[in-house]
């Protein structure tokens, strides 16, 4: 079985995690701050995470998505040797490493675009970008395409074989130097699909179990997630449904999305596929801020770790960190501060560890058992094993789901005969396996 099917991800945005959100001056000596991740490996393992998805780590102008050099670790984080040490330490502890592949666009200081700015149409790299007659917002003497109108993000010409080869060669270096296990493709919905097919062939040639996950927002995710392109995509449909269902006290919303995606009907869209599921990330408000009632953190995390998909937790959110997107992106990407374990971290740890060891949760089918506005229960089943998840967004409630047998709540150690009524406290959850 591919490793990613049993993965539980910890998502780190390195420039924020290391407190390096200031613009790159391109002159300072490398800092070595990325090595701080090594110190947190015991805590990451204790939380039950067996994979890390790193946001951008390569030299960039400011935020990492404005790449300057795909072959060099950002000096604000450290050196290539520093990052290799981090990856080696993670692998020695059984933790997979996934990097952010930002291939749709680069920063204005990207070496090839700088050469174009200097020599204009004479540049051998002019066809690496989408250039036109006219002028740019930066008075370059030519017009170029920026990503969604952001001209500090220069669109690469992915139809150019030289550009595609440069990207593939960069990935080859990352596999050789850092032994990475996969990529998250930034704005995958913008990428040429023939490029995605070529990229998949190259990555699977480098490593047979290499994981490709794409950032997608709307539409039919099968456009990108299929045997010719990506293994997985970001499940933004359920991201919205998760927090909205708790805020509106309407479990029907998230249940509708999960049934639509993974139910038993032939028309269900993604049954048997592994989408990346999350409650927050570096682009959106923290879940503790999004929830109207923070006492809902436990049941929403229980739902995340028991619904179909690959769960991911954004660094700091395991402690209930807050940050509002309306206050700017930097607040979403705060420096990591070591904290003592809390009731929430211990709760997430139990869920994460159980998820990685439970085949019903990793690859099992989904069957809805109970649904009301405030309460939701479902079963995950695989080869005779059953896991039952009970989510209570309301006041104290007793579930009657009609499944026989004695089951153990992995969160409390209590046992129940599920053919009888099962009490679940307000704003809480139970996750059962056969006793």
Task: Briefly describe each language-model feature range.
Residues 1-96, 104-106, 111-115, 149, ...:
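N-terminal structural segment of carbohydrate-active enzymes
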Residues 15-34, 66-80, 149-164, 181-190, ...:
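The substrate-binding groove and active-site-proximal loops of carbohydrate-active enzymes
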Residues 30, 63-74, 103-141, 201, ...:
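Aromatic- and acidic-residue-enriched segments that line the glycan-binding/catalytic groove
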Residues 93, 111-153, 241-264:
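Core domains of carbohydrate- and sulfate-ester-processing enzymes
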Residues 117, 186-269, 323-350, 380-384, ...:
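Active-site-proximal helices and loops of the catalytic beta/alpha 8
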Residues 227, 273-295, 300-342:
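Aromatic/acidic polysaccharide-binding cleft in carbohydrate-active enzymes
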Residues 369-403:
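Carbohydrate-binding surface patches
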Residues 417-435:
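C-terminal beta-strand-rich structural cap/linker in extracellular carbohydrate-active enzymes
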């Amino acid at each position: 079985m591919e490793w990613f099917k049993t993965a539980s991800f910890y998502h780190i945005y390195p420039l924020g995690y290391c407190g390096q959100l200031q613009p790159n001056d391109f002159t300072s000596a490398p800092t070595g701050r990325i090595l701080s991740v090594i110190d947190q490996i015991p805590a990451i393992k204790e939380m039950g995470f067996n994979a890390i998805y790193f946001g951008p780590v390569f030299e960039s102008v400011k935020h990492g998505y404005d790449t300057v050099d795909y072959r060099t670790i950002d000096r604000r984080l450290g050196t290539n040797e520093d990052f290799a040490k981090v990856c080696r330490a993670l692998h020695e502890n059984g933790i997979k490493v996934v990097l952010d592949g930002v291939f749709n666009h680069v920063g204005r200081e990207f070496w090839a675009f700088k050469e174009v700015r200097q020599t204009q149409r004479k540049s051998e790299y002019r066809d690496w970008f989408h250039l036109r007659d006219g002028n740019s917002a930066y008075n370059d003497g030519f017009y170029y395409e920026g990503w969604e109108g952001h001209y500090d993000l220069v669109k690469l010409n992915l139809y150019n074989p030289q550009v595609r080869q440069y990207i593939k060669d960069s990935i080859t270096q990352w596999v050789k130097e850092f032994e990475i296990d996969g990529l998250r493709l930034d704005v995958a919905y913008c990428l040429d699909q023939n490029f995605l097919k070529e990229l998949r062939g190259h990555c699977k040639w480098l490593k047979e179990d290499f994981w490709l996950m794409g950032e997608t927002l709307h539409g039919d995710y099968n456009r990108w997630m299929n045997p010719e392109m990506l293994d997985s995509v970001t499940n933004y449909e359920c991201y919205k449904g998760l927090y909205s269902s708790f805020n509106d006290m309407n479990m029907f919303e998230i249940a509708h999305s999960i049934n639509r995606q993974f139910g038993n009907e032939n028309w269900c869209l993604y049954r048997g596929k592994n989408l990346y599921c999350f409650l927050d990330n570096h682009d959106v408000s923290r879940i503790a801020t999004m929830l109207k009632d923070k006492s809902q953190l436990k049941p929403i995390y229980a739902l995340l770790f028991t619904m179909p998909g690959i769960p991911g937790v954004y660094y700091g959110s395991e402690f209930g960190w807050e940050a509002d997107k309306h206050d700017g992106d930097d607040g979403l990407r705060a420096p990591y501060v070591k904290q003592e374990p809390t009731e929430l971290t211990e709760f997430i740890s139990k869920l994460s560890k159980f998820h990685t060891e439970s085949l019903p949760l990793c690859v099992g089918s989904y069957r809805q058992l109970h649904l009301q506005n405030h309460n939701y229960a479902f079963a995950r089943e695989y080869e005779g094993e059953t896991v039952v998840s009970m989510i209570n967004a309301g006041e104290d409630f007793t579930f009657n789901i009609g499944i026989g047998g004695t089951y153990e709540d992995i969160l409390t150690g209590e046992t129940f005969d599920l053919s009888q009524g099962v009490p679940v406290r307000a704003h809480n959850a139970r996750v059962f396996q056969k006793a």
